[in-house]
């Protein structure tokens, strides 16, 4: 495993914040580099987060902006399943994602407080949680998700919330699930929850208007 200057990583969603509010959130966590993981670095409803405008604004505040939507974006054609939906587990093994890991090695060594940025306010509804942050959490990083109210939540806490959400859904359909799945390990539960999350939020090729 690579050893970095910092093993901390943040994520954030720009949502409909003003640039000033977005800056406040970043500064609260001493962020010095924003890695944009949107496939399309634009927003129809929040033009302040177009790539050029955001890059210029952050540079003026002493924060580095890096676009990595090609490597870490959700809208990818290199890892589709048979239904035309992106498979996050396949995505991690693609050349583009692996190139992103290589690029991130330098970023994580050059900066102390790096955040991945996408559009959704809630990390649980975004691929930054289910794809990119999942990878770094599994590789020993302390991943924290910055929320719109200025608080943050650990990746592991969100994983527990996700597992509980899907287990509750299963129990509503099949109340005897505890007896039937007595050997259903925590690792299996987590992996299955990630797959269900993938099905819920993963990009489909017919959704051409999708921005992430």
Enumerate the predicted regions with their spans:
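Residues lining hydrophobic/aromatic ligand-binding pockets adjacent to catalytic sites
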Residues: 2-212
């Amino acid at each position: 495993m690579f050893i970095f200057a910092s093993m901390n990583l943040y994520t954030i969603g720009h949502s409909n914040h003003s640039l000033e509010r977005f800056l406040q959130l970043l500064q609260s966590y001493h962020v010095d580099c924003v890695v944009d993981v949107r496939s399309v670095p634009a927003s129809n409803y929040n033009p302040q987060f177009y790539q050029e405008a955001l890059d210029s604004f952050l540079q003026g505040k002493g924060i580095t902006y890096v676009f990595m939507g090609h490597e870490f974006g959700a809208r990818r054609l290199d890892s589709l399943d048979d239904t035309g939906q992106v498979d996050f587990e396949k995505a991690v093994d693609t050349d583009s994602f692996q190139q992103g890991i290589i690029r991130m090695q330098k970023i994580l060594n050059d900066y102390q407080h790096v955040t991945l940025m996408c559009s959704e306010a809630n990390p649980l509804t975004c691929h930054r949680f289910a794809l990119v942050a999942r990878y770094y959490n599994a590789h020993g990083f302390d991943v924290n998700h910055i929320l719109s109210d200025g608080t943050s939540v650990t990746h592991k806490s969100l994983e527990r919330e996700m597992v509980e959400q899907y287990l509750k859904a299963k129990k509503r359909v099949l109340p005897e699930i505890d007896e039937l799945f007595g050997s259903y390990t925590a690792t299996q539960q987590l992996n299955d929850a990630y797959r269900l999350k993938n099905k819920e939020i993963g990009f489909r090729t017919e959704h051409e208007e999708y921005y992430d």
